[in-house]
């Protein structure tokens, strides 16, 4: 996805996208660890900066690490932020970041919005989640938002048709899940437990897009 027009495209594809960044930041800001003044927070897969803009607005005291493997996305995020906030920019993956000196156990919270769904379940999802857990202080939380497989197979056809209809009504030729790798709640629970988190607590859902709070175990 090109950075130009990325936010508009996401709002056409994802129900409730306009509220995702605001809700994600508000949830993390209400957590015990990240509520502390000057907390260090990781935005893993920051894209064009939606969560960064919300974080600098809601919590200007936070020290943010904006992480994305795409130089183009980071450049667009930097343009949108325009020098706001206390930010460190990193063109990298979370798996590489956590191995750098001083990164393990550094962060009081993390955000990962619409990232895990792009990783295949061939060890890549587990590696990503494990690296996030290692980046966090014990007891710190991760807000994870992702496209999920439905837990109600009898409604799968209706939900998919509704998603296609939502996109058409938003002025977009309906897209498919090609290139995405959604998993179900049972598989997500297994992966996050193996990575070092407790069970996921669902806090948001719009059709197949679901948001969870995950707490790093001590």
Feature roles, as predicted:
Residues 1-35:
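Conserved class I S-adenosyl-L-methionine
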Residues 145-195, 201:
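C-terminal alpha-helical "lid/dimerization" subdomain adjacent to the S-adenosyl-L-methionine
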Residues 126-138:
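A short glycine-rich, Lys/Arg-flanked "PGG" loop and its adjoining helix->strand segment in the class I
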Residues 195-218:
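Core SAM-dependent methyltransferase catalytic element
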Residues 40-44, 48-97:
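Class I SAM-dependent methyltransferase SAM/SAH-binding core
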Residues 96-104:
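Short conserved loop adjoining the S-adenosyl-L-methionine
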Residues 114-118:
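Short catalytic micro-motifs in class I SAM-dependent methyltransferases
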Residues 111:
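A conserved beta-strand element that flanks and buttresses the S-adenosyl-L-methionine
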């Amino acid at each position: 996805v090109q950075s130009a027009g990325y936010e508009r495209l996401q709002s056409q594809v994802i129900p409730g996208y306009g509220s995702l960044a605001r809700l994600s930041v508000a949830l993390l800001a209400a957590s015990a660890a990240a509520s502390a003044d000057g907390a260090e927070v990781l935005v893993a897969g920051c894209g064009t900066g939606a969560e960064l803009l919300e974080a600098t607005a809601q919590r200007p005291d936070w020290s943010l690490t904006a992480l994305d493997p795409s130089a183009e996305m980071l450049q667009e995020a930097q343009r949108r932020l325009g020098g706001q906030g206390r930010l460190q920019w990193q063109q990298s993956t979370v798996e590489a970041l956590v191995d750098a000196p001083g990164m393990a156990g550094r962060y009081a919270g993390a955000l990962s919005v619409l990232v895990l769904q792009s990783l295949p379940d061939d060890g890549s999802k587990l590696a990503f989640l494990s690296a996030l857990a290692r980046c966090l202080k014990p007891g710190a939380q991760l807000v994870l938002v992702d496209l999920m497989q439905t837990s109600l197979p009898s409604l799968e056809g209706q939900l998919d048709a509704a998603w296609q209809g939502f996109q058409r009504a938003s002025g977009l030729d309906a897209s498919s899940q090609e290139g995405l790798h959604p998993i179900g709640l049972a598989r997500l629970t297994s992966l996050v437990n193996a990575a070092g988190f407790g069970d996921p607590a669902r806090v948001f859902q719009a059709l197949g897009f679901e948001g969870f709070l995950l707490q790093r175990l001590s």
